[in-house]
Amino acid sequence: MVSGCAIDEYSNIETGSVGEPLGVLGGSPSAEDVAQGRKFFGAGSYGLAEKHFRRAVEANPNSVSAWVGLAASYDQLKRYDLADKAYRRALSLHGRQPLLLNNYGYHYLLRGNKGAARKILREAERKAPDDPAIQHNLALLENWSYADNFDGVPEKPRKFDKR
């Protein structure tokens, strides 16, 4: 995936309690749910993806790939509050790695919070200055305007006339 939120980079990572990589997913109940979640996410079935990623984090709360997939699914479902919690959990497990920061910055871009998106994406850029996904998301941020807001998410809640 060139831009946006990438879940594939985390498909083979699980971590222990202090964040060290433990190896390739496989054979565990959470691994099957992560695989199914990735399949549904790729097909645009974000509700089903969320279901599988949620089951994966319940089975293995230390699975970075499950938390990232869950966060990305919540973003697509516009459940930004839950996505934020999932990203913070992934960050606590895996640290402030560039691709994870890229996803977290994109999350704030989707929310319409350009300030937070810029801060996090710039941190990702400092850690991986030549990463094309990070550069693409920074370009999206700089070229973003209220008029082309993704999926109509406003920066501030709109007040509707009650007539």
Question: What label would you give each PLM region?
Answer:
Residues V2-L25:
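Bacterial Sec signal peptide processing site at the extreme N-terminus
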